[in-house]
């Protein structure tokens, strides 16, 4: 078995079955089942889902959306990525799989916006994200131009 790597997940019923393993492992807000089902119905060929397979099973996943214009009340101008619903199955947590997913997004060299969920502030801080507070909630931002050395060869997926 080779070293696990991040890959874009196919939008199909096999992926839907894999997502069911995550149900009940985290908060309802992390559920991607409905989102995946909607993409299957719409036959959306550009999957926003990325994951890591280990031993033939999906063990970690995230949604990644390209946004065309920052325009919101934060320090992003132009295109950026929104990273949603990063989740690693409990058995595989604290082994670097979440970091692998984030580093995959960082390699695209766009600013990244994410919302810290369920006691994850330390995780985002460790990965050089900056906390931002606005009236409608808190989130974290990573800027590639100020973090050129943040993804090293050892960290990259």
From Swiss-Prot:
E.C. numbers: 2.3.1.-
Molecular function, one GO term: acyltransferase activity, transferring groups other than amino-acyl groups
Top EC class, one word: transferase
CDD domains per UniProt: NAT_SF
Keyword Zinc-finger in annotation: no
Keywords: Acyltransferase, Transferase
Gene3D superfamilies referenced in this protein's UniProt entry, alphabetically: 3.40.630.30
Taxonomy of the source species: Bacteria, Bacillati, Bacillota, Bacilli, Bacillales
Superkingdom assignment: Bacteria
InterPro entries listed in its UniProt record: Acyl_CoA_acyltransferase, GNAT_dom, YlbP
Keyword hit for NADP: no
Official protein name in the record: Uncharacterized N-acetyltransferase BCB4264_A4022
N-acetyltransferase domain mapped to chain residues: 9-154
Any single Pfam family the record assigns to this protein: Acetyltransf_1
């Amino acid at each position: 078995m080779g070293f696990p790597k991040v890959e874009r997940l196919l939008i199909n019923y096999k992926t839907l079955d894999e997502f069911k393993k995550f149900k009940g492992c985290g908060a309802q807000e992390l559920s991607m089942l409905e989102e995946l089902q909607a993409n299957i119905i719409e036959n959306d060929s550009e999957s926003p889902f990325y994951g890591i397979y280990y031993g033939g099973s999906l063990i970690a996943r995230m949604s990644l959306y390209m946004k065309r214009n920052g325009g919101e009340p934060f320090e992003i101008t132009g295109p950026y990525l929104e990273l949603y619903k990063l989740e690693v199955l409990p058995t595989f947590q604290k082994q670097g799989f979440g970091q692998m997913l984030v580093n995959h997004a960082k390699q695209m060299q766009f600013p990244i916006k994410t919302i810290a969920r369920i006691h994850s502030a330390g995780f985002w801080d460790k990965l050089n994200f900056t906390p931002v507070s606005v009236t409608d909630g808190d989130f974290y931002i990573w800027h590639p131009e100020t973090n050129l050395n943040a993804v090293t060869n050892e960290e990259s997926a």
